[in-house]
């Protein structure tokens, strides 16, 4: 079966990867035509594919760790790594300068994997695809694999990893005695084919190549499985190796998806690597040590290396995660709930009033409480007063109303911060579109005897505006969980000052430019964006100082 030309990584340059000859060979010779055991075949297709592949230029390959802490350069216990640039711009630029990282392509990650497998194989000397499965089982931790490999119980190790001990390979081959010309039924489709059209794993289960191809394609494309595809035979848990997958699949898109699944498991197990979260971007950021710091991908996306969200200074990852979950749960229905429902005074389930009678019965099967809609007190004392309530000041009703008011106050507080958070998010989206308008304004200015350098202040102003919007957006998340104290008052004053200056700068940039106002606008814009930069820096420095001195107290949601 012919294969596409492309990447083929070999451990020994003198060895070549041979292809399977499905012609009139005897069954016992069939396995000898598979790729050499010292070759990891994961790349016989282009690594760039629209929607699946990677974009951007190539980096020089860095031999770094597959983990952190103090250890070797392989596995999650790995030590230091290759250096790199710190990126720039965007919120938290002052932190970016000291945080070194590299942006790698998917091809380079694949090469990292091959290098990791090669290093392990220099010791254990197994087929490359078997070593890859063993490493995957131990989350690419080389030390753990080595410890288990040499503890004297290899059979148990291979059984746990769902592979057959390579030393038994020759004995398995000798069990095959059927002639290659003899027809036999496939146990999946039950069609008869010559024996030469069948293939299988070391477990001895063989199926026709068409069924193998469809089975692997379904597992990869529909179920998203890569490193855990098992033999299709019922009850067999032996895993399919990489060479078998690449040999039996002809569709380059399926091969590419398989590559991505394998490399994704490598990245996910490595705390020094993280995929860029931008849509359709398949770059990986590699750092020297994991931390909540901003990193910038080649595609332009800046994100927090710790949590993978957009860079969110000044709020910490923990609180941003809680906020996002709260917004997902509450934002769409909170306004309607506040206007149209009340809580049962007994079980606190939310209840909607759908009739004129004030006599309410909770539908919760474990509650069934009867209460008054007006005062939220027990219904029994109301007697026959079906359509009015004269028990407003009774203690039980007052306690229920107090609990209701606290709940409503908490909701109103959430809506206050959520609305401002969303407003700045929407403004940030609009102001990203300002770059096109600013480009046109810069061209107009150059037509009025201003040089290219003289009009760069407009682009700088939009950069600062977007930075301030992003910072302000996340200050409302920080403020939502912040307890009131003297430091929080200073923070709110800094926030208000930055917010006012940002709105003024936004107004300047959206104003029409005429020849008479060019110099006047330039001076105003430059003064204002410099002031915004200064106030943003003051706000962030104050928050970071509070983190260092443990000045902030939080409201547990």
UniProtKB/Swiss-Prot annotation:
It catalyses: [E2 ubiquitin-conjugating enzyme]-S-ubiquitinyl-L-cysteine + [acceptor protein]-L-lysine = [E2 ubiquitin-conjugating enzyme]-L-cysteine + [acceptor protein]-N(6)-ubiquitinyl-L-lysine. The active site is at 357. Changing residue 499 to A: Hyperactive 'open' mutant that displays enhanced E3 ubiquitin-protein ligase activity. CDD domains: BRcat_RBR_HHARI-like, Rcat_RBR_HHARI-like, RING-HC_RBR_HHARI. Changing residue 372 to A: Impairs E3 ubiquitin-protein ligase activity. It holds the Pfam family IBR. PROSITE patterns: TRIAD, ZF_RING_2. Zn(2+) 4 binds at residues 304, 307, 312, 317. Zn(2+) 2 binds at residues 203, 205, 231, 236. Its EC number is 2.3.2.31. Changing residue 205 to A: Impaired interaction with UBE2L3 without affecting interaction with neddylated cullin-RING complexes. It is found in: Cytoplasm; Nucleus; Nucleus, Cajal body. Residues 408-557 are annotated as: Ariadne domain. Residues 182-393 are annotated as: TRIAD supradomain. Widely expressed. A zinc finger (IBR-type) spans 256-317. Its main location: cytoplasm. Zn(2+) 6 binds at residues 372, 375, 382, 389. Residues 1-95 are annotated as: Disordered. Belongs to the RBR family. Ariadne subfamily. It is linked to Defects in ARIH1 have been found in several individuals with thoracic aortic aneurysms and cerebrovascular disease. Members of the RBR family are atypical E3 ligases. They interact with the E2 conjugating enzyme UBE2L3 and function like HECT-type E3 enzymes: they bind E2s via the first RING-type zinc finger, but require an obligate trans-thiolation step during the ubiquitin transfer, requiring a conserved active site Cys residue in the second RING-type zinc finger. The active site probably forms a thioester intermediate with ubiquitin taken from the active-site cysteine of the E2 before ultimately transferring it to a Lys residue on the substrate. Interacts (via the first RING-type zinc finger) with UBE2L3. Associates with cullin-RING ubiquitin ligase (CRL) complexes containing CUL1, CUL2 and CUL3. Interacts with neddylated CUL1. Interacts with neddylated CUL2. Interacts with neddylated CUL3. Interacts with neddylated CUL4A. This is E3 ubiquitin-protein ligase ARIH1. The gene is ARIH1.
């Amino acid at each position: 079966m012919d294969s596409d030309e492309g990447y083929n990584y070999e451990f020994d340059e003198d060895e070549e990867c041979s292809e399977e000859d499905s012609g009139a060979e005897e069954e016992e010779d069939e396995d000898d035509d598979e790729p050499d055991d010292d070759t990891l075949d994961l790349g016989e297709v282009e690594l760039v594919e629209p929607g699946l592949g990677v974009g951007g230029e190539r980096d020089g390959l860095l031999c770094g760790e597959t983990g952190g802490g103090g250890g070797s350069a392989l596995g999650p216990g790995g030590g230091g790594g290759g250096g790199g640039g710190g990126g720039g711009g965007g919120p938290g630029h002052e932190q970016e300068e000291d945080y070194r990282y590299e942006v790698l392509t998917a091809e380079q990650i694949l090469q990292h994997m091959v290098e990791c497998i090669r290093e392990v194989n220099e010791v254990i000397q197994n087929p490359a695809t078997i070593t890859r499965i063993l490493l995957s089982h131990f989350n690419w931790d080389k030390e753990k694999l080595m410890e288990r490999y040499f503890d004297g119980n290899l059979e148990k190790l291979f059984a746990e990893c769902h592979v057959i001990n390579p030393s038994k390979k020759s004995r398995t081959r000798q069990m095959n005695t059927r002639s290659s010309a003899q027809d036999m039924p496939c146990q999946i489709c039950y069609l008869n084919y010559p024996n030469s059209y069948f293939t299988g794993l070391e477990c001895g289960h063989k199926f026709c190549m068409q069924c193998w191809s469809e089975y692997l394609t379904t597992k990869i494309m529909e179920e998203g499985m890569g490193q855990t595809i098992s033999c299709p035979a019922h009850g067999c848990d032996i895993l399919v190796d990489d060479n078998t997958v690449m040999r039996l699949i002809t569709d380059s898109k399926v091969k590419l998806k398989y590559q991505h699944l394998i490399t994704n498991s490598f990245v996910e197990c490595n705390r020094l690597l993280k995929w860029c979260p931008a849509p359709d971007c398949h770059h990986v950021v590699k750092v020297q040590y994991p931390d909540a710091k901003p990193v910038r991908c080649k595609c332009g996306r800046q994100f927090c290396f710790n949590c993978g969200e957009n860079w969110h200074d000044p709020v910490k990852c923990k609180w941003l995660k809680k906020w996002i979950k709260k917004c997902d749960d509450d934002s769409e229905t909170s306004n309607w709930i506040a206007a149209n429902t009340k809580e049962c005074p007994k079980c606190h389930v939310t209840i909607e009033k759908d009739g004129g009678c004030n006599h309410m019965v909770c539908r919760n099967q474990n509650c069934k409480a009867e209460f008054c809609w007006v005062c939220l007190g027990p219904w029994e004392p109301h007697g026959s007063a079906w359509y009015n309530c004269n028990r407003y000041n009774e203690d039980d009703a007052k306690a229920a109303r107090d609990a209701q008011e606290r709940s409503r106050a908490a909701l109103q507080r959430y809506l206050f911060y959520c609305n401002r958070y969303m407003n700045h998010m929407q403004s940030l989206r609009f102001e990203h579109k300002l770059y096109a308008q600013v480009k046109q304004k810069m061209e107009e200015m150059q037509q009025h005897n201003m040089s290219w350098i003289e009009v760069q202040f407009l682009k700088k102003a939009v950069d600062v505006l977007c930075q301030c919007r992003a910072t302000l957006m996340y200050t409302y998340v920080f403020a939502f969980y912040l307890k009131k104290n003297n430091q929080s008052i200073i923070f709110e004053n800094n926030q208000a000052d930055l917010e006012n200056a940002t709105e003024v700068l936004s107004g300047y940039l959206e104003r029409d430019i005429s020849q008479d106002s060019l110099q006047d606008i330039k001076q105003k814009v430059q003064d204002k964006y410099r002031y915004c930069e200064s106030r943003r820096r003051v706000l962030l420095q104050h928050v970071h100082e509070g983190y260092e001195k443990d000045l902030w107290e939080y409201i547990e949601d």
